[in-house]
Amino acid sequence: MRFIHALLLAGIAHSAYASEKLTFKTDLEKLEREKAAQIGVAIVDPQGEIVAGHRMAQRFAMCSTFKFPLAALVFERIDSGTERGDRKLSYGPDMIVEWSPATERFLASGHMTVLEAAQAAVQLSDNGATNLLLREIGGPAAMTQYFRKIGDSVSRLDRKEPEMSDNTPGDLRDTTTPIAMARTVAKVLYGGALTSTSTHTIERWLIGNQTGDATLRAGFPKDWVVGEKTGTCANGGRNDIGFFKAQERDYAVAVYTTAPKLSAVERDELVASVGQVITQLILSTDK
């Protein structure tokens, strides 16, 4: 009798979970219709197992979200002793491209340290600092090689900034899928890809990101711990990837959207709305 009772309870729980996932999908499809958008979402646990998703295997332009795994590659080089965080990277005015606030600020000195460039790339989305790091690691091909090394067979970087943010429809260059990137986030933060010191530093940078107050974290409860890296592309691309801790559970998340008919502010609001849909799912399934 107890066995039958347990089976009934398990069946009820499974049915409730399936219902919440259906609501998750329905809510995202409604947003897509209302905003004339495509929305890709993947939420995974620390082991990379899927919690929920939508258009998970569809390719989207990475935009600046790749700057998080780029920083992870830099930390891996530091951890292995092939790089030093305090090494000075010399550069000139040719390194200043569109949106390079920190690179411009350090130009008078003629250099940034490796860690200064990595932090600027993550927290400010500084394109000049990003290109400086790409120069040091061996270019976009080295970034793609790192993706492969940590088990991501999908994500690819082909160009530097700002060209990699063109987001031309049908162009496979500089793209990823939500599930590939969510699992890359999980691998970096929870899978032992970096030392604990490096992991803690990059988590702190993500939590202190200065470009994402209006995106995912705007749609999450204030008591969740959230760290993220945004991305903006031409042709309506607005993305956000990272991690969140809800009710003592850790998750990695990747959200990629394309909404060419919306304004920049409306695209931020769209990503925040996706955050609200994710919140509803997590709070319902964690009861």
UniProtKB/Swiss-Prot annotation:
Q: What is this protein called?
A: Beta-lactamase GES-5
Q: Any stretches that span the bilayer, and where are they?
A: none
Purpose of the protein: Confers resistance to penicillins, cephalosporins and carbapenems. Has carbapenem-hydrolyzing activity.
Per the record, what is the consequence of mutating E98K? Increases catalytic efficiency about 5-fold, with respect to cefoxitin. Increases catalytic efficiency about 30-fold, with respect to ceftazidime. Decreases catalytic efficiency about 6-fold, with respect to imipenem
Its EC number is 3.5.2.6
User: Which species does the entry assign this protein to?
Assistant: Klebsiella pneumoniae
Gene it is expressed from: blaGES-5
Which residues lie in coiled coils?
none
The record, for InterPro entries, names: Beta-lactam/transpept-like, Beta-lactam_cat, Beta-lactam_class-A
Cross-referenced SUPFAM superfamilies:
beta-lactamase/transpeptidase-like (SSF56601)
Q: Which GO terms describe its molecular function?
A: beta-lactamase activity
